[in-house]
């Protein structure tokens, strides 16, 4: 059986009003971005230090590089810059790693002014996470 990539699912009406911003750079980030692209026909922004080739060569990802040792302030500054560059978009912030999920929880007040945040608050995250 062969797969015809030209017949993959396409959104009925592409959503150019949303912009997923995904923190990280591994294959899981690629998977999240691909799901958004297939469901809504939108581009995504990857914010990471060394995104995988699947992200950097993707036709639906733009990449914003940050240092591998970026502080909360530096990462927050990058995300606020992205928000300022896209005032007409509904920004959705996603993460695929506990470190970045904790970052979002710590900075929820500032980030929620610009991004939809499908994350629990820090208290809930600390109570439920046991790794």
Predicted segments, located by residue:
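Preference for protein termini
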Residues: 1-53, 84-90, 95-98, 110-111
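Conserved N-proximal alpha/beta basic substrate-recognition cap immediately N-terminal to
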Residues: 56-131
């Amino acid at each position: 059986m062969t797969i015809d990539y030209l017949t993959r699912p396409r959104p009925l009406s592409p959503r150019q009003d949303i912009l997923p911003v995904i923190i990280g750079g591994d294959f899981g980030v690629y998977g999240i971005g691909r799901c958004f692209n297939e469901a809504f026909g939108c581009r995504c922004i990857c914010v990471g230090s060394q995104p995988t080739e699947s992200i950097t060569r993707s036709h639906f990802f733009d990449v914003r590089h940050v240092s591998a040792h970026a502080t909360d302030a530096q990462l927050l500054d990058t995300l606020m810059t992205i928000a300022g560059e896209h005032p007409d978009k509904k920004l959705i912030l996603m993460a695929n790693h506990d470190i970045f999920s904790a970052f979002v929880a710590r900075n929820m007040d500032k980030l929620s002014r610009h991004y939809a945040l499908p994350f629990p608050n820090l208290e809930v995250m600390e109570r439920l996470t046991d790794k």
